[in-house]
Each structure stands twice: as structure tokens, then as C-alpha cells.
Curated annotation (Swiss-Prot):
The modification S-nitrosocysteine is found at residues 65, 93, 310. The record marks 212 as: Transition state stabilizer. The modification Phosphothreonine is found at residue 233. It is found in: Nucleus; Nucleus, Nucleolus; Nucleus speckle; Endoplasmic reticulum. It comes from the Eukaryota. Changing residue 12 to A: Reduces nuclear localization. The keyword Ubl conjugation applies. GO terms for molecular function: 3'-5' exonuclease activity; 3'-5'-DNA exonuclease activity; chromatin DNA binding; class II DNA-(apurinic or apyrimidinic site) endonuclease activity; damaged DNA binding; DNA binding; DNA endonuclease activity; DNA-(abasic site) binding. It comes from Homo sapiens. PANTHER family: AP ENDONUCLEASE, DNA-(APURINIC OR APYRIMIDINIC SITE) ENDONUCLEASE. Its main location: nucleus. This is DNA repair nuclease/redox regulator APEX1.
């Protein structure tokens, strides 16, 4: 299908910010490259107008939003719910809620239409991890986790089955500062891949959420300085590539915008990274290939505030 578009910062949870100037070509170019590498150049991303029809001209019938909110209560105080009300998705997926189900903010009941709400959080770690799925339509079936005890202790996955697809929202484990959880992350990646492959063999799959990896160099601002940092190690990038191939799944944003640079979904709170757009693309909508004819658009709402991540939106014509 026709393509619609046209190349970092540090993994979340506080890894050090590194920048590296590009190769010098001339004095003027060198200054410009140095500024852009330091996050000071005009390397901003403008979300283009929403495309609400499929390649065949069918109008979009489903709108899904995903957002790592970095704590539900703080996100609500920062007016995150106002954005959701304006965006008006059919399904809303939230990650890093940091909130047990019995302590959910009452304001969540004010979301118009999103009355079917499902939550998962660690049973023994208040204020850590957690995901939510809110829907206008009642799913046929909802389950939690990936069926593997090692990986189902931290409230990271919700699966909702609908008539024509299965939706998985996930908050993938971070390899951590100093890569202290990289080995665990690799075990997770393998188990998650097998789980998703099983789901996708029965019904078309949509996977969304904070997948905690920038797949290619175009997906973060300073790739050279982050190859040994969580979110951009060779192991994590390889694991993501294997996920795409084995399930198989397509990265909806790169399918439509293969060469669009500076399109990020996460910015560390340090060093004014967001205002300089020194970011990472860690949040994704991945689709079964059979859903690509229904893909209308995959959006990065980079101007929406309320978290160190921004929301992303998917339009499908089902």
C-alpha cells in the first residue's frame, strides 16, 4: 500500500542521557549537527492529519488509544482524562498504572462510554507496574498475564477477545539501569513471543503498549550513545525483530511512515528532553498482517501531556 512519510535519550527509569555529534562536513553543518545531536536543533515531529479510511476506502470503525501514564493518580492530576474525553476512543489501554484495583481513582468512572474496565497490578508491589483496558463494547473474553508464573507476578498483560480480533495490552519489563534485568527481559521476550504466536494462530491480533524497546536507529534521537542502555541493546532489538517475524506482526506506524524521523513516544524528565524532542519510540501498535488492509492510520500524539510518554492512537476499518 502507499507509504505516507519520510532518524536518542535514554531508556525510561532514569538511565543517563547521552548525545553524540554527527560527523563534521563543514563549519556551518557541523554546528547544526552538533546542535541537533545535543537536542537543540529543529528536530520536532508534527503529527499529520488523521487518515480515517482504509487503503480500499472503507471508513474507520474502531479507534484504540494506548498510553503509559506513569501513575494513574498523577496522570489524572495532570489532566490526562481531559485528553481521553476529547480523543474519545472506543478502547483505551493504559500502562504503568501503579495502582491496585481497590485503589482506583473515582474519576475513571467519569469516562463517557468506557464502562467495561479491566485492571491488573502486582499483588505484592503497590505503586509499581500495572495495566488497564477500558472499552465501550464488552469483550467476549478477558484474561490476565501470559500463562507463565515467572512472568505473571507484575501485572503486565491484559488480553481481550472481540468478534474479529484479539487485543493485547502490555507493559514490557525494562532491562533496567545497568541492564540488571536484561537476562530476565530476554526470558520474557521468548515467553511473550510464544504466547502471542498462539493467540495469533486463532484470531487476528492487535498488540499495543509500552514495549520498552526502540527497534531501529530512527526510533530514538541518540542511537550511537545508547547501544549499551536499556531499550536499545542488541539483545532487545533482536528480540523485537524476532517477535515481528515469528508471530508474525507488523509495526503499524512504520508500515505507514517508514522513513519519518523524530517520531517519539517517551522523553526522560531530565535535561528538558521533551522540549528538545530528545526521545524514544517505545510505544507501539503491532498488527497481524491480515489486519493491514483494515489499517487507516497509526498516530503519535506527541503534544498530549500528562506523563513521560505520550499517547498513541490506531484507526481500523473492520
Amino acid at each position: 500500500m502507499p507509504k505516507r512519510g519520510k532518524k536518542g535519550a535514554v531508556a525510561e527509569d532514569g538511565d543517563e542521557l547521552r548525545t553524540e555529534p554527527e560527523a563534521k562536513k563543514s563549519k556551518t553543518a557541523a554546528k547544526k549537527n552538533d546542535k541537533e545531536a545535543a537536542g537543540e536543533g529543529p528536530a520536532l515531529y508534527e503529527d499529520p492529519p488523521d487518515q480515517k479510511t482504509s487503503p480500499s476506502g472503507k471508513p474507520a470503525t474502531l479507534k484504540i488509544c494506548s498510553w503509559n501514564v506513569d501513575g494513574l493518580r498523577a496522570w489524572i492530576k495532570k489532566k490526562g482524562l481531559d485528553w481521553v474525553k476529547e480523543e474519545a476512543p472506543d478502547i483505551l489501554c493504559l500502562q504503568e498504572t501503579k495502582c491496585s484495583e481497590n485503589k482506583l481513582p473515582a474519576e475513571l468512572q467519569e469516562l463517557p462510554g468506557l464502562s467495561h474496565q479491566y485492571w491488573s497490578a502486582p499483588s505484592d508491589k503497590e505503586g509499581y507496574s500495572g495495566v488497564g483496558l477500558l472499552s465501550r463494547q464488552c469483550p467476549l473474553k478477558v484474561s490476565y498475564g501470559i500463562g507463565d508464573e515467572e512472568h505473571d507476578q507484575e501485572g503486565r498483560v491484559i488480553v481481550a477477545e472481540f468478534d474479529s480480533f484479539v487485543l493485547v495490552t502490555a507493559y514490557v519489563p525494562n532491562a533496567g539501569r545497568g541492564l540488571v534485568r536484561l537476562e530476565y527481559r530476554q526470558r520474557w521476550d521468548e515467553a511473550f513471543r510464544k504466547f502471542l504466536k498462539g493467540l495469533a494462530s486463532r484470531k487476528p491480533l492487535v498488540l499495543c503498549g509500552d514495549l520498552n524497546v526502540a527497534h531501529e536507529e530512527i526510533d530514538l534521537r541518540n542511537p550511537k550513545g545508547n547501544k549499551k542502555n536499556a531499550g536499545f541493546t542488541p539483545q532487545e532489538r533482536q528480540g523485537f525483530g524476532e517477535l515481528l517475524q515469528a508471530v508474525p506482526l507488523a509495526d503499524s506506524f512504520r508500515h505507514l511512515y517508514p522513513n519519518t524521523p523524530y517520531a517519539y513516544t517517551f522523553w526522560t524528565y531530565m535535561m528538558n528532553a521533551r522540549s528538545k524532542n530528545v526521545g524514544w519510540r517505545l510505544d507501539y501498535f503491532l498488527l497481524s498482517h491480515s489486519l493491514l488492509p483494515a489499517l487507516c492510520d497509526s498516530k503519535i500524539r506527541s503534544k498530549a501531556l500528562g506523563s513521560d510518554h505520550c499517547p498513541i492512537t490506531l484507526y481500523l476499518a473492520l
